[in-house]
Amino acid sequence: MAGQIFDAAANQSAVWAVILGAVLATAGGFVATQMERYVEHHRRERNAALFFGELLTTLQIILYHAHNAHDRGDPFGPITLRMLKSARKEIDIYDRNRETLFDLRHGDLRARIQNLIIRIAMPIEGVFDATDEIQRCQDQLRDAVAIPRPDLEERVESLRQQRASGYEFIMETVEALPKIIGDLEPLAHQSFRKLGEIGRNI
């Protein structure tokens, strides 16, 4: 009788050991999976912060040089327009990688980046459109040199004002870049200040 009781107790202990082992294995697997997800999420967030930090720093450098060119000679001469086209290319890179933005966990930061890009992209397109339209109007004025065209002259002046306003809006928007870049630095575990300084001194 005592042996039977002992065997039953031993069997019960074995069952509990199996159950405990299964629970620990499940818990261990769950913890390992969660840790893996945590590490992967932070890796992706760091890569995203590096990407957007470098992209926005490059955009800042390009627009810095565009502003310098704008203040010398023809405000919207070939150099200024070339710089603005380079800025547009950086925005195109952003557009192609926009889904990476969701790897940043801070919704406010994501919104600020997206809003800033839109506020720069739209007036840049406006500058290009106005420049092309001004050129067309000036070509028409040259072709009709013997015939006064006050309507075209007024159109050219209006387009120039629109272009100047769009450019000023771009430069005002750019002032928000340093703060956004600074907020990306802790996530990227890297400072972008040196890159910006080198770019401005080129």
Predicted features and spans:
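Juxtamembrane membrane-water interface segments immediately C-terminal to a transmembrane helix
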Residues: 35-60
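Interfacial alpha-helical end/capping and short helix-turn segments at domain and membrane boundaries
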Residues: 53-54, 58-202
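Membrane-embedded hydrophobic alpha-helical segments
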Residues: 1-40
